[in-house]
Amino acid sequence: MVTKKPLVINQPAVGKLIRELRLLTGLTQEQFAATLGVTYPTINRWENGRSKPSPLAMEKIEAQLHEMGDPGTDLLHKYLAN
């Protein structure tokens, strides 16, 4: 069985990625938090660089990016390059 390595993006890029993903999906921080199973303050802390997502949260974020197709892939490449 092959295990997938979690996506690793450092701050501040991960906060920018999360904010841009959330805005692309048209969700508020509270709505986006619900899709990831976290609280609104958690999303706020991620976006503002005060904390970073857990590996499990990053897996969920990566899944959302892939589900978006080209826009999500483009966003992923944009922040992986930084």
Task: Label the predicted regions.
Residues 2-24, 62:
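A short, Lys/Arg-rich alpha-helix, primarily the initiator
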Residues 4, 55-74:
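DNA major-groove recognition helix of helix-turn-helix/homeodomain DNA-binding modules
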Residues 26-44:
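Short alpha-helical DNA-recognition segment
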Residues 79-82:
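Helix-turn-helix/homeodomain-like alpha-helical modules used for DNA recognition
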